[in-house]
């Protein structure tokens, strides 16, 4: 079982950086502007990150030719997926959840910079149970029940 409160603390400074970027740039820009701003903010805050990390998913242990790119991996265990759209949908959440599962990362942040107030959603992946967990502890998605 994962410890939600310690994971919330782990992502806190990344979430703070996200809000700082939105505070400076404001709403309504395109995604790449916010990604560049976040890269600068992470660097200034000395938060370790990799931008646009590419990976090949696997099918039954065999790497596929398909390539996925994650916007940011912070602190080696936090997937950050940036959007600049009118509304976040279930498909955007599914994208983040799959990145977390495929990369075996415990924390995921889905951010929508487009609205007047940035929308930040945090999720956690329990590697033991293969479940996505919300910040309040309830199971959002169970990969064992597909």
Where are the regions that the model predicts?
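Conserved catalytic cores of phosphodiester-cleaving nucleases, focusing on short active-site segments
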Residues: 26, 70-88, 99
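Nucleic-acid nuclease catalytic cores
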Residues: 83-132
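Interdomain/boundary linker segments immediately adjacent to catalytic/signaling cores
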Residues: 1-25
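Active-site metal-binding core of divalent-cation-utilizing nuclease and nuclease-like domains
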Residues: 27-77, 116-128, 137-144
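Helical mechanochemical/support elements of P-loop NTPase systems and associated helical scaffolds
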Residues: 10, 34, 92-95
